Design a protein with these regions (language model features):
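Extended two-metal-dependent nuclease catalytic cores across DNA- and RNA-processing enzymes
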Residues: 2, 22-25, 75-248
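Conserved RNase H-like, two-metal-ion catalytic cores of nucleic-acid enzymes
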Residues: 5-6, 10, 16-55, 71-72, ...
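Charged catalytic and DNA/RNA-contacting regions of genome-maintenance
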Residues: 129-131, 137-174, 317-318, 335, ...
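Conserved "right-hand" nucleotidyltransferase catalytic core of DNA-directed polymerases
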Residues: 232-353, 436-632, 653, 663, ...
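Function-dense linear segments that define catalytic or interfacial modules
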Residues: 340-345, 405, 411-428, 433-434, ...
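Catalytic palm active-site di-aspartate
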Residues: 395, 487-496, 659, 723, ...
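Conserved catalytic core of nucleic-acid polymerases
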Residues: 439-442, 496, 602, 609, ...
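C-terminal polymerase-core module
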Residues: 518-522, 526-578, 746-794, 798, ...
Length: 881
């Protein structure tokens, strides 16, 4: 067997990972971004290069011989941040769990250890791969050793072997040492020869081979280069010595100690779970063949022949695990290829399309609990057949979302199976591939498809009791069974129903936008004095800051920043700014909503069938995609015009019901602030009331400006805004914003107490809860980084309020949906956006629909203040506002 060693520069990779990735923390508040980046890279390297041996070298704090010879060596380096320092020991512990060899030796750097170990391995017939972010290691490249230099943080590597170094740099790997001796290295504070850069250095090395060769032939060098070299000969020789990686460090190990693979998978999984690396869990199965990883489900798969017997068995158990596989097609008439069914998760049956109606009883029976993975898809798959999947009881994706709402990558069955069962289930990408070459489920051969589905069904049955126990312990079992699971059916029907779009009006709007864009382009070119690509930040930056001479607010790596924040600060500097802002807004409206909507109108019914997502946001809010209806801009009139294209069908009207200030009402209830509760109970305008409290005037004396400012304060408090954030919103001094907030908390003192208690609870528990016990974990609240800690505090203040508002709208949706069904109405709930529900009501049913919607929304939960609903009717979404 060929022996392959991967040796990693631990300090280099963890440093690069730390600065490449945003801050991450586990539930205990431990920083994990550097560990995550390192581990992700490690798994990728193992998967790519399949090493038989691995070692990781680390620096030690003790000074090296380089520090002794040159006191200024690495003197300019910044002190290591505490957030990075605290990740070293957990990383080393993880490496130990992988049974990966580690080396660190006093007096020597990781580079020297790598140089020595790689030489020993080469001499023993190994193929060697060195992984580092430091180009110094290129000097170690040879016919037996490839140096992998990380790029794009630690996401990719560039390979350097002996031939590729010569091809790219026209010098041998060892001549890299001479080059560094000449040009120095700022990061290590190696001086080199002042005035000699890379270009001149390469030219000299190519001509004279080495620093020694240069000085042996110094008289053949002319001009200032000769002078620089003569004046700095000792510096050049010393710099070369400092840059030379030592390859005879007194290491004590034998190569057998570096063998990779003899590890306990459960130990690694336990550490991954502790660190919160749920997205990495499935990748352990790719590496491991030990008994710890279950690679095959112990199941039987067969075609269902005796349907009556199976129906009786399902009725006896009152549970059915279901997974449908559909052919590609339109949501309204998509055909089912197979349905896989099981009672116990071990004996799995499949049927084809011709048997669907024979099983209708078990699908539609409310007595039989339906269990599965992404049950919304299964519900929608049966809709074209006129079959309604009743009693959607347990979906492992939704259960896992409640258990860990912070991990947006962990809800795939592969991650769930590995996390709870140490079982390998292929990811969607592993099964189907990725990109343009990705297959569809319908294209898989039956053996591969059925094997994968059986793994999913086995996982559903096996993890359900574990998840149920977790949810019970955290008091979220009620949230699952009474809110999230009943909501699946509601969202599925909303997707299937869709919303009617006026295509003619949409095209008309597109024409208007194009005319405005053309006009704005002309005006921008006139002010700037030339034509240029307005959509290019680089070209726009040159126009604004060089040609027009506007003050530079911020720079990026590629030039001037022209983002929205920068443009906002330049508004008073030139008339071109307002036109650029408007241009960008209209271009986005046209591309996202006009062109975007036109491309997804269903040809069968002329409606748009948005996907409603239940497991995306950390707060519990529902989101939507294709299109994202939550983001349709309403502050601009042109943005509001987009709502004109969403219309009611013939013989119908849109009934729009919007909660009035639901988050402030939740705040009043949760804080038990008497002043705010009293204001809502007496139907006082809460923003006017707040203005009178903050500005110490009677409610009759409140001006429109004061009310507007008070509104910003009210919602600023809900979102945990700082005095600085409020000052930016209101365009007032920070001191004044601070006074507003202080006055607010003086008048609403229970709210201040409530917010303080929430922060304290979040700091001690690591999470906050909503009125229905939904948890939002906030690890950043324990960060030693001031800005992140403050962001955590803001999230802690907002999450219970916004999350409770999400709980309320979900309950309202379920109740409205049920009432429409119970009354046998043809009217349908079709949209949910923020705190707003839209029902497409048949003309003859409008009165009863209005009553149902208002009653169910206002009585969704019992609070100490009323839930008020604003209700409007119109032919389009725009008309209801």
């Amino acid at each position: 067997m060929n022996k392959t060693l991967v040796i990693i520069d631990g300090n280099s990779i963890i440093n690069r990972a730390f600065y490449a990735l945003p801050e991450m923390s586990n539930k205990e508040g431990l920083k994990t971004n550097a560990i995550y980046g390192f581990t992700n890279m490690l798994l990728k390297i193992i998967d790519t290069y399949n090493p038989t041996h691995i070692s990781v070298a680390f620096d030690r704090k003790a000074p090296t011989f380089r520090h002794i010879e040159f006191k200024e060596y690495k003197a300019g380096r910044k002190k290591m941040p505490d957030e990075l320092r605290e990740q070293f020991e957990p990383l080393k512990d993880l490496l130990d769990k992988f049974n990966i060899h580690r080396l660190e030796i006093d007096g020597y750097e990781a580079d020297d250890i790598i140089g020595t170990v790689s030489k020993i391995a080469e001499d023993n017939g190994f193929k060697v791969y060195i992984v580092t972010g430091d180009k110094d290691a290129i000097q170690l490249a040879s016919n037996k050793t490839t140096t992998l230099i990380t790029k794009k943080g630690v996401g990719e590597v560039e390979e350097y072997d002996y031939d590729s170094v010569i091809e790219k740099y026209e010098m041998t790997p060892t001549q890299f040492i001479d080059l560094k001796g000449l040009m120095g290295d700022k990061s290590d504070n190696i001086p080199g020869v002042p005035g000699i850069g890379e270009k001149t250095g390469i030219k000299l090395i190519k001509e004279f081979s080495s620093i020694e060769g240069i000085f042996d032939n110094i008289d053949s060098i002319k001009g200032s280069t000769k002078k620089k070299l003569e004046e700095n000969k000792e510096l050049a020789i010393m710099s070369k010595k400092l840059a030379t990686i030592i390859r005879d460090v007194p290491v004590e190990f034998n190569l057998e100690e570096l063998e990779y693979g003899n590890y306990n998978t459960k130990d690694i999984l336990d550490v991954f779970k502790y660190l919160g690396f749920t997205s990495l869990i499935p990748r352990i199965g790719n590496l491991d063949e030990s008994e710890e990883i279950v690679n095959e489900a112990n199941v039987e798969i067969s075609k269902l022949e005796d349907i009556d017997e199976f129906i009786n068995k399902v009725k006896e158990n009152n549970e059915l695990i279901i997974k449908t596989v559909t052919r590609e097609g339109n949501i309204l008439d998509k055909r089912i290829k197979y349905i896989f069914l099981s009672v116990d998760g071990k004996k799995i049956y499949y049927v084809e399309e011709d048997s669907i109606y024979k099983l209708e009883y078990i699908f539609t029976s409310n007595e039989i609990k339906k269990l599965g993975y992404n049950l919304k898809d299964d519900y929608i798959s049966l809709k074209p057949y006129g079959i309604k999947l009743e009693n959607i009881y347990f979906d492992i994706t939704i259960a896992e979302y409640l258990i860990d709402s912070m991990s947006s990558t962990s809800y795939e069955c592969s991650a769930i199976a590995m996390k709870y069962l140490t079982k390998k289930v292929k990811t969607k990408e592993e099964l189907l591939g990725k990109g343009v070459k990705a297959k569809k489920y319908q294209d898989l051969d039956f053996e591969e498809l059925s094997s994968h589905i059986s793994q999913i069904i086995d996982t559903v049955k096996s993890v359900m009791p574990i998840m149920e126990e977790n949810l019970k312990e955290s008091n979220m079992d009620g949230l699952l069974y009474h809110v999230e699971m009943p909501l699946v059916e509601v969202l599925a029907d909303m997707e299937y129903e869709g919303v009617k779009v006026d295509k003619e009006k949409l095209n008309e709007l597109g024409s208007q936008f194009k005319e405005i864009i053309k006009k704005l382009e002309s005006e921008i070119y006139k002010i700037s004095g030339e034509e240029f690509n307005i959509n290019s930040p680089k070209q726009l930056g040159v126009i604004l800051f060089e040609k027009l001479g506007l003050p530079v607010i911020k720079k990026t790596k590629t030039g001037y920043s022209t983002n929205a924040e920068v443009l906002d600060k330049l508004k008073d500097q030139s008339p071109i700014i307002d036109k650029i802002i408007e241009y960008r807004q209209i271009v986005k409206l046209n591309s996202t909503y006009v062109e975007g909507l036109l491309s997804i109108i269903n040809p069968i019914d002329g409606r748009i069938h948005s996907s409603f997502n239940q497991t995306i946001t950390t707060t519990g809010r529902i989101s939507s995609t294709e299109p994202n209806l939550q983001n349709i801009p309403v502050k601009l009139e042109m943005g509001r015009n987009i709502r004109k294209v969403f219309i009611s069908d013939k013989g119908c009207k849109l009934v729009d019901a919007d909660y009035s200030q639901v988050e402030l009402r939740v705040l009043a209830h949760m804080s038990q602030d008497e002043t705010m509760i009293d204001a809502f109970k007496h139907n006082e305008d809460i923003h006017t009331k707040t203005a009178s409290q903050v500005f110490n005037v009677s409610m009759d004396e409140v001006t429109s400006k004061q009310r507007s400012d008070a509104k910003a304060v009210n919602f600023g408090i809900v979102y945990g805004k700082s005095d600085f954030g409020l000052s930016e919103d209101l365009n007032i001094p920070v001191k004044q914003a601070k006074e507003y907030i202080e006055n607010y908390f003086n008048k609403y003192n229970k709210i201040k107490e409530f917010m303080d208690n929430i922060i304290e609870d979040a700091s001690s528990n690591g999470y906050v809860t909503t009125i229905l016990n939904r948890r939002r974990y906030i690890p950043e609240i324990k960060s030693s980084n001031f800005m992140l800690r403050n962001a955590g505090k803001r999230a802690a203040m907002n999450a219970p309020i916004q999350g409770s508002a999400a709980d309320i709208i979900k309950i309202a949706m379920i109740n409205v949906y049920k009432k429409l069904e119970e009354n046998n109405l043809k009217s349908k709930l079709i949209l949910q956006v923020h705190d707003e529900l839209i029902v497409e009501a048949v003309d003859s049913e409008i009165d009863i629909v209005k009553k149902i919607v208002k009653d169910e929304m206002e009585n969704a939960v019992c609070l100490d203040v009323n839930l008020d609903v604003d209700l409007n009717i119109g032919d389009s979404w725009y008309d209801t506002k």
